[in-house]
């Protein structure tokens, strides 16, 4: 086969279109004698063959996404290997498609088999994107929030495009309040608060009691070391537990937009203003990569990995 001249401009265009590596793009164009569309197919086929190898790689980057439709909201997390991919328009489109389907699917198992616009399932779509982007991708998790009446607030922090970013939050407010605009504004503010303050529960009764007892034990041991009488230690521990609750329980936290008031007090004031009860039924907070072990590599390992594909 005679030598085919492939310009750097075409290689760059193929890389931007597919997210594949520069050398992979150049080789694909050589193999297809410069045919751009055939080169895309070549990369996809090559990538599909290599998808099993990529599936073992740690994915701790990527994007979270939130979407609200009426009285239903969903949050998802789709992971990639590098932050670079999160800025890839193709990957962003994939995440948008998945979160749109999640509103109807309602469970992650149904979501994986849901059909995208190209009639491929979400699972198949992810595999195809592994092929063209050149990184392992995973639909890690999803959660749904539904209310019977009221408002759902959503907030995405560090957005790369609207509704896609590093932290996604939903907050459900059940209420018969007629002024939906003010109710939605409160739900939005509480969602922003949740993103920034990372509460562990709505109220103290729903807080993990194992966590509470662990903190209580730590506080007790610290107080005992100070040599105080037992009855004083008990009071000190209860005081520290109350402070702990004010740090991790949503309703007891100082409100981000008005720190002198707790979230509970802000809700009570809004109830008086709107003439209706307001109850936080659920909140969801997804932070990208939380709980995932990050793979540590030195520079030499990274270079070797790149050169060996």
Curated annotation (Swiss-Prot):
Disulphide-bridged cysteine pairs: none
Region (Involved in Mg(2+) ion dislocation from EF-Tu): 82-85
CC annotations in GO: cytoplasm
Record Gene3D superfamilies: 1.10.286.20, DNA helicase RuvA subunit, C-terminal domain, Elongation factor Ts, dimerisation domain
Keyword DNA-binding: no
Primary localization class, coarse: cytoplasm
Compartments (UniProt record): Cytoplasm
Keywords tagged on the record: Cytoplasm, Elongation factor, Protein biosynthesis
Pfam family, one: EF_TS
Family, similarity comment: Belongs to the EF-Ts family.
Job description of the protein: Associates with the EF-Tu.GDP complex and induces the exchange of GDP to GTP. It remains bound to the aminoacyl-tRNA.EF-Tu.GTP complex up to the GTP hydrolysis stage on the ribosome.
Protein name per Swiss-Prot or TrEMBL: Elongation factor Ts
Organism: Rickettsia canadensis (strain McKiel)
